[in-house]
């Protein structure tokens, strides 16, 4: 039986996009820096609009929609049927975004079909992240990108990503994160290497310490201005990307 609680994602409905008391509001706040970083990687690698992108564990499309709105052909997959139903219902007209229920360990997608694969805030939610990286490498084309975001296994990450989440979002389910499933950058690099991926960058990510954060702490609700920024050292979360050889 899995130690991590992934079941609640299927039942969020429109809370994916509304409300400030549930932990998913932090995912909404975090989506901005994920999209920003993904676009930076795409620009660096020459992956332009029209490229095919697979968003693994996409939820209700918090990252998929902004990318599709910029002209990327995005397919989102997630094991949570309710999240996929919400994503389909929320898909804006005129954007190339499709969604399907699929397992991150075996997506069912053709080998080498995607210019980029996104593993954003999901590797710490699975028991076998190495197998997810292997599947990402399988469906990425040679020279394609695998973009990731996850949490380091440090005391700071334990404090902020587990206990801090409960402080700023009063409606946080139990076991949203499990400390033992957090991944050190060195471990991720080793797993990626075994999967045939060359990690090119790891960059720290942390909350912005400002009035919005303290407002959230005091009221135990996520302020609309709650933001994340990059950090020199990946002591809490980190983003990065790898290239398929």
Describe these PLM feature segments.
Residues 94, 168, 190, 194, ...:
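A C-terminal cap/extension of S-adenosyl-L-methionine-dependent methyltransferases
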Residues 105-116:
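A short acidic, Gly/Pro-enriched loop at the edge of an enzyme's catalytic core
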Residues 150, 170-187:
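Acceptor-substrate binding/catalytic loop of class I
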Residues 62-106:
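Class I SAM-dependent methyltransferase SAM/SAH-binding core
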Residues 28-49:
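Conserved alpha-helix/loop element of class I SAM-dependent methyltransferases that forms part
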Residues 1-20:
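N-terminal, positively charged/glycine-rich alpha-helical extensions of SAM-dependent methyltransferases
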Residues 130-142:
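A short glycine-rich, Lys/Arg-flanked "PGG" loop and its adjoining helix->strand segment in the class I
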Residues 147-169:
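Conserved class I S-adenosyl-L-methionine
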């Amino acid at each position: 039986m899995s130690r991590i609680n992934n079941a609640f994602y299927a039942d969020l409905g429109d809370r994916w996009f509304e409300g400030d008391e549930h932990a998913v509001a932090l995912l909404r706040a975090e989506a901005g820096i994920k999209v920003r970083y993904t676009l930076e990687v795409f620009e660096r690698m020459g992956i332009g609009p029209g490229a095919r992108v697979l968003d693994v564990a996409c939820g209700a499309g918090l990252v998929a929609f902004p990318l599709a709105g910029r002209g990327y052909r995005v397919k989102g997959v997630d094991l949570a049927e309710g999240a996929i139903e919400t994503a389909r219902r929320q898909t804006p007209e005129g954007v190339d975004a499709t969604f399907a229920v699929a397992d991150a360990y075996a997506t069912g997608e053709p080998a080498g079909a995607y210019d980029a694969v996104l593993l954003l805030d999901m590797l710490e939610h699975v028991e076998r992240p190495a197998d997810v990286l292997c599947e990402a490498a399988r469906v990425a084309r040679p020279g394609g990108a695998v973009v990731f975001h996850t949490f380091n296994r440090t005391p700071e990450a334990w404090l902020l990503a587990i206990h801090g989440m409960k402080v700023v979002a009063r409606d946080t389910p139990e076991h949203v994160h499990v400390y033992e499933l957090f991944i050190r950058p060195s471990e991720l690099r080793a797993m990626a290497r075994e999967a045939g991926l060359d990690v090119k960058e790891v960059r720290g990510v942390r909350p912005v310490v400002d009035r919005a954060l303290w407002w959230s702490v005091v009221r135990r609700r996520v302020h609309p201005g709650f933001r994340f920024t990059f950090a020199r050292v990946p002591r809490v979360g980190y983003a990065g990307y790898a290239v398929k050889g």
